[in-house]
């Protein structure tokens, strides 16, 4: 599964640290929730990286959730770049 979710956000709470801002909490959580629904709530291994902006909150992140039997979810969210905002799932035996 690959999911992208992001667009240019100039304002609101997403870039305000004192208001709990950040791309993972504001946007990325939806990708995570979808992956958990697709893979049945199984606890994955998490590999993640991101970029902290001048405001002290994460502006982008890329996360890979690794599930049993070689299943993965690659999740990307960004608050400074317009992404495709789509999900692709792949089935294999």
Regions found by a protein language model. Give the residues of each.
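Contiguous beta-strand/loop segments that form the cofactor/metal-binding neighborhood of enzyme cores
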Residues: 33-93
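Predominantly a Rossmann-like dinucleotide-binding segment in NAD(P)-dependent oxidoreductases
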Residues: 1-49, 54
């Amino acid at each position: 599964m690959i999911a992208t979710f992001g667009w240019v956000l100039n304002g609101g709470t997403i870039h305000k640290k004192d208001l709990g801002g950040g791309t993972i909490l504001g946007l990325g959580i939806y990708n995570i929730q979808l992956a958990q629904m697709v893979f049945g709530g199984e606890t994955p291994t998490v590999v993640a990286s991101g970029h902290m902006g001048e405001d002290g909150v994460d502006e982008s992140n890329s996360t890979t959730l690794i599930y049993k039997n070689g299943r993965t979810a690659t999740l990307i969210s960004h608050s400074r770049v317009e992404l495709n905002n789509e999900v692709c799932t792949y089935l294999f035996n």
